[in-house]
Regions:
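Short, low-complexity, intrinsically disordered N-terminal peptides in bacterial proteins
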Residues: 1-8
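ABC family nucleotide-binding domain
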Residues: 9-232
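C-terminal boundary and immediately downstream tail of ABC-type ATPase nucleotide-binding domains
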Residues: 2, 222-223, 227-252
């Protein structure tokens, strides 16, 4: 029996139970619980240092946890014998920094992991990579190097690179934070289109208007706990906790 034999699409695609994470003596996640269904768009917001980026890095096993459980399609992410390659096929992640290889073209950057890591057929991967560049509205930029692209274009190549592994869940960690204001919109549009196609997306973001428009559910974190969560309308128009109200009053 494989780790995913007991999972079905009617169950949460990501299930987080009572996770705790510390860096030395500092506990940054203090018993987080969350269920995310297939096709949902989840936005995690909160002040700096609230644990939101650490949380999604734990989902992808980039950070370990001290207690609790994270399952993706029934696969226990933090079990000792985890096949990281299997996990990387299930979960894609895009960071604030694009981390593209500067001496590789946009097309080559997208193709690298499927060809070199997954040993997929190069011709088939190239066809998929070209389709992904078109999907993120960068057709015609196949042979461009990262230095020839704007920040927003590089971030869209990074998104296409993650999609090339054909994941079921996409994680976005403040992907617009390092971008010039005029390029933020094009990246958010790409994520919005992914969500419309049914991709399960978990985003850490400071883009409140985007969160309100696209999210199915919003989680507000502060000091390592989920303070409040709800639908966008409920969250923004009828917040209950004083910490949530204070945070929203400072950014809206």
């Amino acid at each position: 029996m494989t780790a995913t034999d007991t999972w079905s699409p009617e169950q949460p695609i990501v299930s987080i139970r009572n996770i705790r994470k510390s860096f030395g003596a500092l506990e940054v996640l203090k018993g987080i619980n969350m269920d995310i269904m297939k096709g949902e768009v989840i936005c995690i917001i909160g002040p700096s240092g609230s644990g939101k980026s650490t949380l999604i890095r734990c989902i992808n096993a980039l950070n370990d946890i001290q207690e609790g459980s994270i399952k993706v399609e029934g696969m226990e992410v933090h079990r000792p014998d985890l096949d990281k390659l299997e996990l990387r096929k299930k979960i894609g992640m895009v960071f604030q920094q694009y981390n593209l290889f500067p001496h590789k073209t946009a097309l080559e950057n997208i193709m690298m992991a499927p060809v070199l890591v997954m040993k997929e057929n190069k011709t088939e991967v190239e066809e998929r990579a070209r389709a992904l560049l078109k999907k993120v509205r960068l057709d015609g930029k196949e042979n461009a190097y990262p230095g020839e692209l704007s920040g927003g274009q590089q971030q869209r190549v990074a998104i296409a690179r993650s999609l090339a592994m054909q994941p079921d869940v996409m994680l976005f960690d403040e992907v617009t934070a390092a971008l010039d204001p005029e390029t933020v919109k094009e990246v958010l549009l790409t994520i919005k289109e992914l969500a419309a196609d049914g991709m399960t997306c978990i985003l850490v973001t400071h883009e409140m208007g985007f969160a309100r428009e696209v999210a199915d559910h919003i989680y507000f974190t502060d000091r390592g706990v989920i303070v409040e969560h709800g639908t966008p309308d409920t969250f923004f128009d009828n917040a209950q906790d004083e910490r949530t109200k204070l945070f929203l009053s400072q950014i809206l």
